[in-house]
Amino acid sequence: MNNSSTVAMISLGCPKNLVNSEEMLALLQDAGYAFTDDLAKADAAIINTCAFIESAKTEAIEKILETASYREENPKLKIIVSGCLAQRYADDIRAELPEVDGIMGTGSYSEVVSVVEAVLAGDKPTRRGAISAPLYDTPRAVSTGPNWAYLRIAEGCDNRCAYCVIPSLRGKFRSRTKESILEEARLLAASGVKELIIVAQDITRYGIDLYGKVCLTELLKELCKLDFCWVRLHYLYPELIDDELIDEIASEDKIVKYLDIPIQHINDTILRRMNRRGTGEEIRALFKKLRERIPGLVLRTSLITGLPGEGEAEFEELCDFLREAKIERAGVFPYSPEEGTPAALMPDRCSTEEAQRRAELCMEIQAEIMDGFAETFIGRELDVLVMGREPDGTPWGRSEYDSPDIDSRVIFSGDAAPGDMVRVRIDSVDDGELIGEQI
């Protein structure tokens, strides 16, 4: 198709959202659209939003208004809001944000070409398709760089955590077929991707809806036969991490010894209120087993402070757990009440300020742990995937112990270029970042 129109894509939120953005880019590319990062030159801007917590909603609205400000120098700019905010608040967006031309929910990503065509023609479409529709296979325009990419293996979630709106925005859990996943992985490997990051709301449930059993281990065995250097696992729920999966992670060199296991809390009362399966003791036992069975393992987790019912005793138990478990990477978030969730109706809610204070205290504990962990690398050699260069030309990258955007970096002297995998000797630590020299 001949098309002279130019589109800008702004992707907010989680890696799963970024994959949706990349799928939309590929559909637009096939339709002949060109892309730009310059909003002053774009005909249309798509803002793919998150609405998981209050801060994500605020970020999305601010980005919409910021994008609209470019109309002063680019009056023709059309704005499309897609993703979770659009799915959840389409009517409110239409009523309160006249800056928005098109609205496209999480069930309508495949309609992006027709939505862009409509807004460029002067229409104001609102599309919200079925959020639990079967997954469709579509190419992606990978935007993460020359050497790494996300691979989404499922969509939606069946876990029904009491604080979470994801099932109402993304639908029930739906696994992709193994054939579909492997075909995409082969294309990524052939394009030069060295690190494959496996994502879904809960990758440990992979296959249970399609094959009647969890199949993550089987899938990993097949993925590791392909030409990747690293395979990274994100969002494993604790209760489905079994011995077979642990053995595969421990024995397969391509699977990095870094696991992202969101636990949210350690106190049994709070876990029950969260509608999380398992107990604090089971979490402790799992982490102990993982460290025993997988030498050198680095753990990442997510925690929530201030859920209704969390008093000082429950919070202190969480702090004590952080000190004892010495989890190397963690994100701590103050509880955000979300309408339509069971937790939003619970009594005994602490104030927003108190939830924030507790999150900050947890992060102070975590900062000490992370600083101590960084010091252990001094004098060691690490494989580093080169991501870019500092303004002065110094290369930087990530080790297997660092996931993109959320963890640390390795900055080193040498002549490596983005996309390279090099060996670096670590000489020092600067504000949590490792400093070294290419060998």
PLM segments and residue spans:
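Generic beta-strand/beta-sheet core signal
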Residues: 10, 199-201, 234-236, 262-264, ...
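Terminal RNA-binding accessory module
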Residues: 345-439
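Proteins enriched for Cys/Gly/acidic motifs involved in redox and nucleic-acid/cofactor modification
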Residues: 1-206, 244, 259, 281-292, ...
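Conserved, mostly hydrophobic/aromatic
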Residues: 161, 181, 198, 233, ...
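Conserved SAM/AdoMet-binding glycine-rich loop
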Residues: 79-80, 88, 93, 190-313, ...
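A structural micro-motif
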Residues: 5, 33, 77, 101, ...
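Short, solvent-exposed amphipathic alpha-helical segments in soluble enzyme
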Residues: 25-27, 120, 248-251, 275-278, ...
